[in-house]
């Protein structure tokens, strides 16, 4: 029997990077997996990479209407869940003098509001003994210039992990957070011009005690540990950052 045989999983933000790597490991282990994303191209590439066993659904993690529809779809596909991995998120770097209300709202809508309502709408589907894993960020513990709104939104999400863990204990659902440091995903190149992205990569390597970027697979292994192995752990945050937040 495969390690995750019979497990039913939804990954919010699962069409690239850390979410996609987690989906691959779960599918390889025999799980049934539904992943979401916004980009048509990303959805198509994810379906191709994950294969026909994966359910790939267009859904905007900021939209409560989309989340309602996704919960209905999940109920129809799986009936119940063993893991909800809330991974959708994005950073807009904005120094203090350039922050606008639109940037503030975008960062909190995607990185805090969306995850909170995702858990609210999916909690009734999660089996006793099931798990929620939220993706926070090293930006919620490290003061980084230009990250005021993103870091604050991720800090709010970290707080949600604690509170939701307390609220869902009666249902025997654990809630934890995985906290990535610099991870080698396309997000840097999407957020910055090529030259700036290269400079950021080099600068971050210098800050990380282990002197390298992490991989999506390293995040995926941490997520699966929290989801299925850490059965006496809830409300916790697991840094996967090469020691940056600790040393």
Feature locations, PLM:
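Conserved glycine-rich cofactor-binding loop
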Residues: 15-16
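Alpha-helical segment proximal to the catalytic Tyr-Lys
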Residues: 124-125, 166-170
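C-terminal substrate-recognition "lid" of short-chain dehydrogenase/reductases
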Residues: 125, 212-240
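Residue(s) in the substrate-gating loop at a strand-loop-helix junction
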Residues: 137
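Short, small/polar-rich loop/turn modules that mediate ligand/substrate recognition or access, typified
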Residues: 169, 174, 234-235
């Amino acid at each position: 029997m495969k390690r995750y045989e019979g497990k039913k999983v939804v990954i919010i933000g699962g069409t690239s990077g850390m979410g996609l790597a987690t989906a691959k490991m779960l599918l390889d282990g025999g799980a049934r997996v539904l992943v979401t994303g916004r980009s048509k191209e990303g959805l198509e590439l994810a379906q191709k990479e994950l294969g026909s066993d994966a359910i790939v659904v267009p859904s905007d993690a900021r939209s409560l209407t989309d989340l309602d529809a996704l919960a209905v779809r999940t109920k129809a596909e799986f009936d119940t869940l063993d893991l909800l991995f809330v991974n959708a998120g994005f950073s807009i770097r904005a120094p203090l003098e350039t922050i606008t209300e639109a940037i503030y709202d975008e960062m909190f809508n995607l990185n805090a509001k969306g995850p909170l309502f995702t858990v609210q709408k999916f909690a009734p589907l999660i089996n006793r003994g099931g798990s929620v894993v939220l993706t926070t960020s090293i930006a919620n513990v490290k003061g980084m210039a230009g990250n005021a709104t993103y870091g604050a939104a991720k800090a709010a999400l970290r707080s949600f992990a604690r509170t939701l863990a307390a609220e869902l204990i009666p249902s025997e659902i654990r809630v934890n957070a995985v906290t990535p440091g610099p991870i080698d995903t396309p997000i840097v190149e999407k957020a910055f011009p090529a030259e700036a992205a290269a400079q950021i990569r080099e600068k971050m390597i210098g800050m990380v005690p282990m002197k390298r970027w992490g991989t999506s697979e390293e995040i995926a292994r941490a997520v699966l540990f929290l989801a299925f192995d850490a059965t006496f752990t809830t409300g916790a945050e697991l840094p996967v950052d090469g020691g940056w937040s600790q040393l």
